[in-house]
């Protein structure tokens, strides 16, 4: 078993935001391999985030993003369980990153799939079925279903990879949220947003 140094624990904490004991355990389980420990903590923190999902979120922050050309702006509300986390730098940075993403992607209309009204889904499904009318009958429904899934990814926030792919390693907003939730030990919820664009 590899000797775990305080410097390794600090580096892992800085990279993941996990607690000291979690970092020590992850390093011990991976024989001091930092990269493997990061992966292990992501898995564990993700599981922890799932367990936090049912807790009430009565605190949070509203953050704004105004594009440098002053033609697009976004307000976003991100909620959590305590005012302590609402003031946390990582939490506030996440809310700002979400606002920036929404500003960059004009197709977003809803936070998640659950918010898309059934009548809107039905209307889109009918359009996709008509577009596939010339295909064999046995594949029409699958084509329409695939197009609906792709459309939902375009119009809902949480399933989209963040526009800053380099910083977030191509992760979706939901994956980033789940990691943050696990890191902070609280439920983190993107509640709502408003996007404003000149001339839109």
Language model features: what each stretch is:
Residues 2-200:
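N-terminal assembly/interaction segments in proteins that build large macromolecular machines
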